[in-house]
Amino acid sequence: MMKLNRREETLPLPPTPYVVSDSGQFDGNDGKWSTFSINIGDVDSGQGQNFRVLISTSSPVTIVPGATEWCDSDCARTRGVEIYNGQQPRGIEQSAQWKLAGIYKMPEPHWWNESYRIDQSNTTGVWGVDNVGLGTTSIQSPILGEQYVVETLVEDYFMGSFGLAAGETGPSGGSKPNFIDNFYASHQIASKSYGYTAGAHYRK
């Protein structure tokens, strides 16, 4: 009787889930919710610009506040703009990696309608591509290059947001895979699925 030996073969394990801790602060457009830290413009040096942002399950892009006349430095802090190079900026400061794409309409949340509008200017933003990292800037932060970042100047988008929608987005003829697609393609996560809890201040 032939004896079959078990073939020794090691199958690669899928990547473990990547866990992003909340910022430890509560911010929001319509209340106080858990925010999460992201960094923009880093090149594995720990010198990126940090932002506290809300999570958007319907948005495909990263949206962050830009400097505007109606929001001073104290206001910018409440919009999630963190201290950068020892100073409080009023919005995103374009990094050496920033590439301008143009001014286009911002993606609106699935629940949005005109009755929510508080700013009568149009909802366009300055689109560009830059490096986007998870968590506060550090040499351990996972960073993806060539990600769409939208700079918003309108009060309707008071806080920035980190989009988790899968697929591609961008101006006509300039679509790029979204962050979660690129994160999956770089073998840093096992699938394009995610779990998320929006902690509220009153439930502390």
PLM region spans:
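Aspartyl protease catalytic domain
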Residues: 1-29, 133-204
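Signature of the N-terminal lobe/flap region of pepsin-like aspartyl proteases
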Residues: 20, 28-147
